């Protein structure tokens, strides 16, 4: 009798162990599949980014998580995320742990890398962008822009489109970008006279189209700020001049006082 009981116990224990191992294998396979799917989505569909600064206020607030869609076309007026190949940013912020960086890599966690920035596209290749006209407006290819719908407001009054006076012609395969909080955005304007090793002065002000991750289409969190970004109507009807875009930007700077308060570590 005791032998039979012992045999039954051994068989029962072996069955539990087999089921446990099978369950572990299934969980591992499910996790691996989820990571692969997430990585594919990140590589070919879209990516989340955490915004730490106020350079795009009040359209995008610090702490918002936005989704950049790729591959997707973008146009003037769209908000885009792009790589900081021009080294606009200063010292890098502290890195996440190895687990956190892996989570970013596979798309489980939003990207917090300092190697990305987010701005609004003002000029496309061949465009002439200038500030400011008789009414203090930015203009693109001679058309004044009504930016009141997205510029940062103080006590209900939009900030000045730009304290810096300039006129540029955007070179081939590059774009000119600005933040919505013009007084707190270290954008293309602020790099028009920067030295650029191996290139002409001011070249780093113009973002290579190849560096654009994609247009930011949604704020996905916090839930109270979930929204969809659309292209402002003021950019409608501007002539396409990409066919005549120069290889080198034309840059004219006018004497003016400019104070940009955006911190060195500005974007994600």
Where are these regions (language model features)?
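Hydrophobic membrane-insertion alpha-helices, especially the h-region
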Residues: 26-44
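Soluble "head" domains of membrane/secretory-pathway proteins
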Residues: 2-22, 44, 50, 61-257, ...
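N-terminal signal-anchor transmembrane helix
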Residues: 53-56
């Amino acid at each position: 009798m005791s032998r039979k009981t012992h045999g039954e116990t051994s068989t029962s224990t072996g069955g539990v162990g087999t089921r446990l191992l099978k369950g572990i294998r299934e969980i591992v396979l499910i996790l691996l599949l989820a990571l692969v799917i997430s990585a594919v989505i990140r590589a070919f569909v879209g990516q989340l980014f955490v915004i730490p600064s106020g350079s795009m206020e009040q359209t995008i607030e610090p702490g918002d998580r936005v989704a950049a869609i790729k591959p997707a076309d973008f146009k003037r007026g769209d908000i885009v995320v792009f790589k900081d190949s021009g080294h606009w940013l200063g010292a890098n912020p502290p890195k996440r742990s190895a687990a956190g960086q892996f989570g970013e890599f596979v798309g489980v966690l939003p990207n917090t890398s300092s190697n990305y920035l987010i701005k609004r596209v003002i000029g496309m290749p061949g465009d002439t962008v200038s500030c400011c006209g008789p009414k203090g407006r930015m203009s693109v290819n001679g058309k004044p822009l009504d930016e009141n719908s997205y510029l940062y407001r103080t006590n209900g009054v939009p900030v000045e489109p730009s304290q810096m006076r300039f006129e540029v012609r955007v070179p081939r395969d590059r774009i000119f970008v600005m933040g919505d909080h013009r007084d707190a955005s270290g954008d293309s304007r602020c790099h028009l006279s920067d030295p650029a090793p191996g290139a002409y002065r001011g070249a780093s002000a113009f973002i290579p189209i190849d560096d654009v991750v994609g247009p930011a289409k949604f704020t996905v969190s916090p839930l109270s700020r979930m929204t969809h970004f659309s292209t402002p109507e003021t950019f409608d009807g501007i002539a396409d001049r990409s066919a005549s875009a120069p290889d080198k930007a034309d840059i004219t700077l006018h004497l003016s006082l400019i104070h940009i308060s955006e911190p060195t570590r500005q974007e994600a």
